């Protein structure tokens, strides 16, 4: 079996049926293998788009996303996508071609050390030099990708290795049962939560990647401890559930009243204000659960750290709970969340021109429907979206949540989300600046019959940065953009395009775009 076929056959054995890629000579043997193994290759227009689409695919399906690029600039163009996935804790496997081993370091075409470039932004990076060892390297990469806190991995595949021939076997990987918390730590956690008057749960990305949706619901319904969700865990407990307060934007009033917080699968980074104000007072006691011990102590040390898989630990906590449910506090917390929700929802009503940004977000929510996958990207546009976009099921709201503050992810995310869930409506709300990064992936969507609706907030500027520039300095510059007719880009590839300049027309226009099926 040729090396390219080995790669494809091994991936097929792990259940992979779609990959994202940008072609080049050094990686072509893998594409041939994908054809033979029945793996769909969704070819993008930029390598960053391929990796980001793979991450979105992972965040919708809960399974690793796979991407391929060629050697040299193929690798360098993919680095930001890797950094986003790794910082976000998303399992993404990028493989690239490489110059044949005999031509390394000769100044030949597209020869660059992909391993050295990608190591700083991945959990693991390496190069395979022997066709017979391809399965071993693939297995190592996969285990590193999904083991502990998930992340991005990279494997470099020299051209002569991919064209080599070997007799190998492939099979699905088997994994050990994930660990739970120690009995002593578990008992302490149950005591702290049971004695608390105003406990809260914050569920982060680790809860999603552990597959803890059922376990989170069971724990919440038994204990009646209110839950807020963030990042990849949005929708893990649906917004609107009796025990779910929703996103952090609506949970703030309850959080600052809490005396004990159970933090599930998230670090104290910017997404939770580093464990300090305005979401935390410093007086609450923290119980932090994470599969990755190095997550403990970042910016704030918890009173109790439980090392274990979130899904397993939640089952342990539910089984061990013997305190009274926190019904009264849950009602109070829920009411505070509803107050915040009403305040944010009030911003979605407006009229006239220019169109208020809240009106755009509100129209997206109403027209997309409860089963849609919503995506936001940009500065100002994303800020409005995170306060108004709901999540009624896991994987239904995607936005960049890495500490890099990366913009330009939206169009590739929409592409990957639609590939992951072809039967669901996908709507992207994006700023005009961010749209420019991935605009040509509209051609990818059209070519692969992956329709989604992109709603562009077009203010002719890098708005968020321009606001800050104007606040700090006496003049603004380098933050202006043309107020382009971006709808014509969609039309150029056979899609539906419409320009809207009045608030009253936003909802109907979004409806027409969705109904067009383009």
Region spans (language model):
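Glycine-rich, acidic loop regions that bind phosphate or pyrophosphate groups
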Residues: 96-137, 159, 231-335, 510, ...
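Active-site diphosphate/adenylate-binding microenvironment
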Residues: 7, 22-35, 336-423
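Glycine-rich, anion-gripping cofactor-binding loops and their flanking helix/strand elements
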Residues: 59, 205-287, 392-424, 437-440, ...
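A short, small-residue-rich loop immediately preceding and capping a beta-strand
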Residues: 17-20, 40-42, 60-99, 202-205, ...
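Thiamine diphosphate
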Residues: 95, 104-105, 109-110, 255-258, ...
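Conformationally flexible catalytic loops at phosphate/diphosphate-handling active centers
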Residues: 140, 144-195, 344-345
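Phosphate/pyrophosphate-binding active-site segments
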Residues: 132, 168, 191, 283-378, ...
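Glycine-rich phosphate/diphosphate-binding loops that line cofactor/substrate pockets in enzymes
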Residues: 5-17, 56-62, 86, 144-148, ...
């Amino acid at each position: 079996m040729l090396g390219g076929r080995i790669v494809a056959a091994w991936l097929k054995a792990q259940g992979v049926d779609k990959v994202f890629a940008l072609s080049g000579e050094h990686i072509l043997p893998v594409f041939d293998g994908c054809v033979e193994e029945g793996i769909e290759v969704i070819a993008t227009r930029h390598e960053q788009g391929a990796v980001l689409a793979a991450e979105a695919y992972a965040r919708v399906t809960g399974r690793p996303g796979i991407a391929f690029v060629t050697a040299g600039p193929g690798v360098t163009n993919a680095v930001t996508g890797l950094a986003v996935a790794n910082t976000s804790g998303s399992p993404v496997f990028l493989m690239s071609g490489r110059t044949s081993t005999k031509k390394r370091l000769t100044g030949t075409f597209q020869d660059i050390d992909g391993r050295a470039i990608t190591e700083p932004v991945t959990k693991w990076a390496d190069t395979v030099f022997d066709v017979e060892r391809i399965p071993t390297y693939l297995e190592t990469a996969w285990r590193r990708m999904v083991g502990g806190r998930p992340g991005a991995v990279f494997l470099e595949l020299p051209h002569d290795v991919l064209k080599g021939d070997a007799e190998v076997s492939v099979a699905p990987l088997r994994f050990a049962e994930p660990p739970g918390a120690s009995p002593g730590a578990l008992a302490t956690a149950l005591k702290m939560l049971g004695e608390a008057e105003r406990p809260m749960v914050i569920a982060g990305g680790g809860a999603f990647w552990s597959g803890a949706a059922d376990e989170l619901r069971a724990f919440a319904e038994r204990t009646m401890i209110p839950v807020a969700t963030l990042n990849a865990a949005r929708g893990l407990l649906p917004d609107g559930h009796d025990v779910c307060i929703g996103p952090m934007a609506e949970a703030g009033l309850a959080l600052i009243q809490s005396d004990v917080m159970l933090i599930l699968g998230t670090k104290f980074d910017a997404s939770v204000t580093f464990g300090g104000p305005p979401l935390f007072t410093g007086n609450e006691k923290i119980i932090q659960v994470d599969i990755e011990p190095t997550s403990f102590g970042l910016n704030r040390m918890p009173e109790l750290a439980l090392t274990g898989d979130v899904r397993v630990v939640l089952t342990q906590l539910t089984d061990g709970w013997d305190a009274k449910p926190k019904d009264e506090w849950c009602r109070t917390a829920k009411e505070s969340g509803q107050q915040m929700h009403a305040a944010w929802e009030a911003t979605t009503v407006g009229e006239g021109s220019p169109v208020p940004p809240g009106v755009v977000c509100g129209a997206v929510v109403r027209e997309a429907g409860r089963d849609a996958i919503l995506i936001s990207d940009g500065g100002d546009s994303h800020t409005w979206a995170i306060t108004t976009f709901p999540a009624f099921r896991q994987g239904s709201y995607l936005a960049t949540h890495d500490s890099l503050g990366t913009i330009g992810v939206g169009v590739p995310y929409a592409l990957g989300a639609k590939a992951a869930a072809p039967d669901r409506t996908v709507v992207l709300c994006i700023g005009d600046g961010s749209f420019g990064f991935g605009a040509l992936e509209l051609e990818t969507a059209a070519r692969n019959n992956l329709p989604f609706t992109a709603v562009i907030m077009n203010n002719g500027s890098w708005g968020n940065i321009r606001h800050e520039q104007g606040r700090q300095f006496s003049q603004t510059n380098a933050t202006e953009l043309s107020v382009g007719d971006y709808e014509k880009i969609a039309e150029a590839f056979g899609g539906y395009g419409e320009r809207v300049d009045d608030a009253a027309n936003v909802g109907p226009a979004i409806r027409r775009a969705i109904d067009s099926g383009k």
